[in-house]
Amino acid sequence: MQVILLEKVVNLGNLGDIVKVKDGYGRNFLIPQGKAKRATEANKAEFEARRAELEKQQAEQLAAAQKRGEKLAGFMLQVTQKAGVDGRLFGSVTNGDIAEALTAQGFEVSKSEVRLPEGPLKAIGDYQVHIALHHDVVVEITVSVLGE
């Protein structure tokens, strides 16, 4: 199935690219999420008519993400969790916990934007965590896990 991408899709292409994808990926993910349309002649003509509008929208989203990223860059977040004597936590600190703590601090961050490369944090200490605000804007913050 050939589709026209309506926004940048990681590992696939950029706005306006016509790419060939598996039928299930196109029908079940790209098209319902509004990331692509089938590459028919009518849709190609409609896309070309709306191209400038879509590019402007994408540029605005990037600018907003960069603005949020400047505020977040280098931020140090402290999270407290019950811990044992050896420094291991009872439970763990997940991306949802980090997103909640950042929202409480005044930053709008969803849990899907928080990237934990080694999985949930399970011990006391300082960790570098990536916040992916946009495909092109990834900010690194420090999360300090403290024991109670």
Swiss-Prot record:
One Pfam family, short name: Ribosomal_L9_N
Key word RNA-binding present: yes
GO molecular function: rRNA binding; structural constituent of ribosome
Taxonomy, superkingdom: Bacteria
Gene3D superfamilies the record matches: Ribosomal protein L9, C-terminal domain, Ribosomal protein L9, N-terminal domain
Keywords in alphabetical order: Ribonucleoprotein, Ribosomal protein, RNA-binding, rRNA-binding
Cellular component, GO annotation: ribonucleoprotein complex; ribosome
GO BP terms in the entry: translation
Family statement drawn from the similarity comment of this UniProt entry: Belongs to the bacterial ribosomal protein bL9 family.
UniProt function note: Binds to the 23S rRNA.
Listed NCBIfam families: L9
This protein's name: Large ribosomal subunit protein bL9
